[in-house]
Amino acid sequence: RVSLQDNDQKALERAPALIEGALTTLTKGDAIAADEATAAQGKITTVASVPDAVEDAALVVEAVTENRDIKRAVFANIDASAPPDAIIASNTSHLDVFPLMPAGRQARCLITHWYTPAYIVDLVDLAPGPETTRDVMTMMHALYAGMGKYPIAFETFISGYVANRIQAAMNLEIFRMLDEGLASPE
């Protein structure tokens, strides 16, 4: 079961149609069967509040804008409502969110950075915090691998992860080639 929450009511109202569109794309591409798409859609519900979303959750994934104050507030709300044994994951693309996460839950906190569109791109970065247990990392790696994803587990937090760092290296090389006159922008 997946509970989806967003403070933007219009975004929350649009979510089921967007999910249905993604599942239709996967069905048309023969990535999943139509009955699997229907079953998946039936497991997703939208809810109005963070407490409603996380009250029975085994895994909570935070995916709000890259703003420390907003993330801190969301983590506090999750901490107040999620079961004590829930794993808390952040989908941050570059922030070190571990100082923002609940102090008493650090052993069960990690970063699970999905690439977009997540229903097509199979890569997921996993980064532990200073106190994240090996068991949590192993469990999350197995969960994502079981979904058909390719999790890349880091030993520690780094800013930028795999694809971002490869893209940065490619950009540097392209600009070097342009500067040296080895290639034209056209």
Show the residue positions of the predicted features:
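NAD(P)+-binding Rossmann beta1-loop-alpha1 motif at the extreme N-terminus of oxidoreductases
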Residues: 1-25, 29, 81
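Conserved SAM-binding loop
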Residues: 4, 46, 90
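A structured beta-alpha segment of the ubiquitous adenosine-cofactor-binding alpha/beta core
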Residues: 25-81
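Rossmann-like NAD(P)(H) cofactor-binding subdomain of soluble oxidoreductases
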Residues: 59, 64-124
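Internal alpha-helical scaffold of NAD(P)-dependent oxidoreductase catalytic cores
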Residues: 126-157, 168-186
